[in-house]
A protein has these predicted regions:
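N-terminal secretory/membrane-targeting segments
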Residues: 1-58, 512, 516
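A long, amphipathic alpha-helix that forms part
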Residues: 42-55, 170-179, 192-232, 236-244, ...
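Alpha-helical transmembrane segments of integral membrane proteins
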Residues: 354-516
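Phosphate/adenylate-binding glycine loop and adjacent helical scaffold
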Residues: 304-368, 392, 396-399, 465
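Active-site-proximal alpha/beta segments of enzymes that process anionic O-linked groups
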Residues: 32-43, 52-183, 192, 277-287, ...
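Substrate-binding rim/cap in mid-to-C-terminal beta-strand-loop elements of soluble/periplasmic
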Residues: 100-110, 246-289
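Catalytic metal-binding/acid-base residues of hydrolase active sites
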Residues: 68-69, 189-191, 236-238, 262
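Anion-binding catalytic surfaces of enzymes that hydrolyze or transfer phosphate/sulfate esters
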Residues: 9-11, 21-23, 152, 159-213, ...
Length: 516
């Protein structure tokens, strides 16, 4: 009898040790698991500008202020100047508000689900075509100036010249970075850094916004809006406490302004899909569309509200409208092949692929349920006691949610903000929740031996959830992207698995010392 009990205790201890190791491996590996720069379900459509644009802008300045909230952008003098000269809109940057994926979205016209750009770490070029590559292929010269190399890394064939300023005190808009070329991409980083370090509602953030306002004003002084084109936007905003990555309004909704040659003037703040940024540049510059841009269930009709229509460019705009319809038709035909029936729409395709993920979730849940039942039978836990344990596990999940919400916030990428802050706070959340759960068990059940067994059950459930995430969503993370909580879970889940695994190991060792 004792020998069998010792064997079960040793097996439980082994499971907990394995869980701790798996937690470390999956947690550290999740960042690398996110991206796949070959992309997913790319539809390539060949385009040709059959009617040339009558007059192309002399210089184009495309400005991405990293981490600029919409409310802060509205206070900038340069944004107000661009609004008077053209139009500003509220741009929806999607639900994956991480910087490198947003650079991909702005440049290609495609969402992160399909570009495959899902983290800031992977430096490999993106398969989806960018507007910068289109511009160079059309004979234009493209320059970049940034505190990061990420635009150039994503699209190495998209730039003739790229100035990388490692010193973030440097002005990326300054003339010493070279004369203005046909197309110029400017990307300052310090507003985002202020948001991470101090929060989007802090005086330091406001000071960074004031700095970029002044530096952009210096750039505008070198331009002539009767001849040149300026686009001002951001990749994402910041929450008040700092952080981005989720789909909160203050994070995903940013200001985008178009002003200069070829831009229609309007004073309202109409809606805009961030995926339409690259297509809008294509229309205003007289370029073909990026071949992989989103078409079908899109926001491309806004292009005809941004471009100023005149008798001189009527034929050109008609040609571009026809091109958009060709893109939509080709996407529809391709989707009908993939779906096997009509109508071929992106929402239907997303729904089908998400449905496959849901079925895998169901299979995982069934497997976990069977394992839990077998665990109860192996431990000879009566039905009533099993129900109490089930309620206790549910209570433990509720405790985790409450403590996480109180300390970190929403269950999404936004709470990560800075790694050096997130890791100790998330570890504290997991430890507090684990201790509270243990104390609740001691108070309700009052059986230390059963506590150790039930804690091992929790560790097994967490382990199954972490491995199940890989089974459900793939390695690398597949298509479509998981919902926000499931997208974030491997970060916190790994920390919880390690924490609960160590607590369970401690309980098992204590129980062994107490056993006769």
């Amino acid at each position: 009898m004792r020998q069998a009990r010792d064997w079960r205790r040793l097996a439980a201890l082994g499971l907990c040790v394995v869980a701790v190791v798996v937690g470390f491996v999956l947690g550290e590996g999740y960042i690398d698991r996110l991206p796949q720069h070959a992309g997913y379900f790319l539809v390539a459509v060949d385009d040709e500008v059959r009617v040339p644009i009558p007059t192309r802008p002399r210089h184009t300045a495309f400005i991405v202020v990293d981490g600029l909230r919409r409310d802060s952008a509205e206070t900038m003098h340069v944004a107000q100047e661009l609004a008077r000269a053209g139009q500003c809109r509220i741009s929806d940057q999607g639900s994956f508000t991480v910087s490198r994926p947003e650079y991909a979205l702005l440049s290609t016209g495609l969402e992160a689900d399909r570009t495959g750009s899902r983290n800031n770490d992977l430096t490999a070029p993106l398969a989806a075509e960018s507007i910068w590559q289109v511009a160079r292929a059309s004979g234009l010269h493209v320059a970049g100036s940034s505190h990061l190399r990420w635009f150039e890394q994503l699209f190495p064939a998209g730039f003739d010249r790229f100035a990388h300023e490692k010193d973030h005190r440097a002005n990326v808009f300054a003339p010493e970075h070279g004369e203005l070329l046909d197309v110029n991409v400017f990307h300052p980083l310090y507003v985002d850094e202020a948001g991470h370090q101090h929060g989007g509602a802090s005086p330091a953030y406001a000071a960074a916004v004031a700095r970029v306002d002044g530096e952009i004003a210096g750039l505008l002084a070198r331009l002539d809006l009767s001849q040149d084109l300026v686009v001002l936007t951001a990749d994402h905003g910041h929450r008040d406490a700092g952080g981005h990555g989720g789909a909160q309004p203050e994070i995903k909704n940013v200001l985008v302004c178009f002003a200069g040659r070829g831009v229609e003037r309007r004073s309202d703040r109409a809606a805009f899909d961030g995926r339409s940024t690259a297509p809008a540049l294509a229309v205003l510059l007289g370029l073909r569309f990026p071949r992989n841009m989103r078409a079908g269930d899109d926001g491309l009709d806004v292009l005809w509200e941004i471009a100023h229509a005149t008798p001189e460019n009527a034929a050109y705009l008609a040609d571009r409208r026809a091109a958009v319809e060709r893109f939509r038709t080709q996407n529809r035909i391709t989707l009908e092949k993939w779906l096997g029936d009509q109508p071929g729409t992106w929402p239907r395709f997303y729904e089908r692929e998400a449905g496959a993920q849901t079925r895998r979730i169901g299979a995982t849940a069934l497997f976990v349920l069977v394992c839990a039942v077998l665990s109860f039978r192996l431990r000879k836990v009566p039905a009533r006691a099993a129900l109490v344990t089930t309620a206790w596990v549910a209570f433990g999940m509720f405790v985790v949610w409450c403590v996480h919400h109180a300390v970190l916030g929403d269950f999404d990428f936004t709470v990560i903000n800075l790694r050096e802050r997130f890791l100790p706070r998330a570890s504290a959340v997991a430890l507090v929740a684990a201790v509270a759960t243990v104390l609740a068990h001691l108070w309700i059940v009052g059986d230390r031996r059963r506590l150790a067994g039930d804690m091992v059950l929790v560790v097994g459930l967490l382990l199954a959830a972490m491995l199940g995430h890989v089974y459900v969503y793939g390695w690398p993370l597949g298509f479509p992207l998981p919902p926000q909580p499931a997208r974030y879970f491997p970060f916190f889940g790994a920390i919880a698995l390690v924490t609960y695994g160590l607590v369970a190991c401690g309980l098992l060792l204590l129980e062994r010392r107490r056993s006769p």
